[in-house]
Amino acid sequence: MLKIDHISKTFAKGTVNEKKALDDISLTVDTGDFITIIGSNGAGKSTLFNSISGEFFVDTGKIILDDEDITKKPDYLRSKDIGRLFQDPLRGTAPSMTIEENLSLAYQRGKHFSLTPFTHKHHDVFVNALKDLDIGLEDRLTTKVGTLSGGQRQALTLLMATLVKPQLLLLDEHTAALDPATSIKVMKLSERIAKEHHITTMMITHDMEDALKYGNRILMMKDGKIIADIDEETKKKMTVEELVRKFTETGEANDRVLLH
């Protein structure tokens, strides 16, 4: 379970560029939840993810993950329990290393580091995991990751983030840079992995259809605050038009967030 207790974050405090990115946010995410998060650019969505993953410390409040206070825990220590995918398929992998070497690094998250002996020892584990992706990478373990397509690379990054089951998976617009067909495939794969492994998941999206289609709850953000929290029963009954209408009522709608 993730519990966020009254967190706030202000950047460039005391200057003309001062920006309150998170404003007294409180949130409880139950184990196994799949929450989609919508909001215009600058609403605080990625900043919320950054605060959870430890890219910076919040100014006030607490972040509790699986009954542990991680508020002041460095990002490299949080990475054992928190997996994250970004919009850019180039992030999250080492392009000059092979698929097998990348998986070896991911498999050692939170453990003592070694590479060559570890890779050979867990060859079968990696082959089976790649087969489960069903994108034809199981016979390409020696392929350099930098030669993969964007969709293949994002699917591999998803596997790397979940190879050792995390307490929490953060999906930060992870399909936005992919073509429509590949985006659908990666989204279905994300949903399947989250369900099969019972991984608590939070996903930022600008696609209203995806916000409704995936997950059991929707959060709407504006000006560093959560302004709406839509539960599963309400979400099931909503149409895209109703969700867009609810969003436009906040005065925050723009072309990008209305994509559907």
Where do the PLM segments sit?
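A short, flexible loop at the N-terminus of ABC-type nucleotide-binding domains that lies
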Residues: 1, 10-24, 74
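The feature captures the beta-strand-to-loop junction immediately N-terminal to the Walker
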Residues: 38-40
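Helix-to-loop junction immediately C-terminal to a conserved catalytic motif
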Residues: 53
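Conserved ABC transporter NBD signature motif
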Residues: 61-69
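ABC ATPase NBD coupling module
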Residues: 69-83, 91, 113, 119, ...
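H-loop/switch region of ABC-family ATPase nucleotide-binding domains
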Residues: 205-206
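Conserved beta-strand-loop-alpha-helix hinge in the C-terminal portion
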Residues: 225-249
